[in-house]
């Protein structure tokens, strides 16, 4: 089975290819998708998948990720990509100055669409916002700590076992194995 992962982020496509290996061949296309605004990452991913399928007319996967910082009432939430581009990790750390509660949740919505069926999956991990550590990964990985290590300090294999995206992609994998084989 061949599925197109529509994302501008090559790291995400590689992560998906690794998790879905042996079940689906992942093709990466960085199709420009209009920015969607919904309350949940699953809704945004589903909207992106519907759009991507309408353009490409082949099975697609899309995703959307949110970072929900508890001390900041869930900010940046579903606007995580925009916030990363504009104020970055240093901006988040500045906003959190003076807050003792450093807890946060990373959540990813993964959506599959093949023209006949659309299905969404979510994955979430809880962690802590810390000063940047590590040099692998991307985005918020250097400041998001889980069990004493930031996502940027983990190997790709370690991250693929526990990340929010990996959890959603593993749910997609189980569903594809049951429904599409």
List PLM regions with ranges.
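Anionic-ligand binding patches
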Residues: 1-4, 11-181
């Amino acid at each position: 089975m061949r599925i197109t992962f529509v994302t501008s982020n090559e790291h995400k496509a590689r992560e998906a290819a690794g998790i879905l290996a042996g079940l689906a061949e992942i093709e990466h296309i960085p199709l420009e998708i209009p920015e969607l605004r919904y309350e949940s990452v699953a809704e945004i991913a589903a909207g992106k998948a519907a759009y991507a399928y309408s353009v490409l007319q082949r099975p697609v996967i899309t995703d959307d990720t949110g970072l929900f910082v508890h001390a900041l009432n869930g900010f940046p939430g579903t606007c995580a990509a925009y916030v990363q581009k504009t104020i970055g990790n240093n901006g988040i750390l500045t906003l959190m100055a003076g807050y003792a509660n450093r807890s946060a949740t990373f959540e990813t919505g993964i959506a599959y669409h093949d023209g006949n069926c659309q299905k969404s999956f979510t994955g979430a991990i809880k962690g802590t916002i810390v000063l940047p550590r590590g040099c692998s990964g991307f985005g918020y990985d250097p400041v998001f700590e889980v069990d004493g290590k930031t996502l940027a300090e983990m190997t790709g294999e370690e991250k693929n076992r526990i990340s929010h995206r990996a959890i959603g992609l593993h749910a997609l994998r189980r569903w594809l194995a049951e429904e599409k084989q």
